[in-house]
């Protein structure tokens, strides 16, 4: 399955709007609305991009 419209592409940097203490994360993979992100302080997290709008970030 490909990325859903509006989801960040792999290798991009994002922040979780409700978890600022997680820090910046790099998108590892995208499968539809399922986005796997490796955050600085939370490790790998699977995000449902249909529910959470990840914010663009810069490392």
Kindly give the residue locations of the regions a language model identified.
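Mixed-charge, Lys/Arg-rich low-complexity intrinsically disordered regions
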Residues: 1-15, 21
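Glycine-centered tight beta-turn/hairpin loop motif at sheet-sheet or coil-to-beta transitions
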Residues: 20, 40-42
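SH3/SH3-like beta-barrel fold
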Residues: 35-39
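Intrinsically disordered, low-complexity, charged/polar segments
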Residues: 44-59
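Short beta-strand-centered aromatic/proline hotspots
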Residues: 23-29
């Amino acid at each position: 399955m490909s990325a859903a419209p509006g989801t960040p592409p792999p290798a991009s940097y994002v922040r979780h709007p409700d978890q600022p203490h997680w820090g910046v994360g790099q998108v590892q993979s995208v499968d539809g609305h399922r986005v796997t992100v490796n955050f600085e302080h939370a490790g790998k997290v699977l995000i449902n991009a249909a529910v959470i709008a990840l914010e663009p970030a810069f490392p």
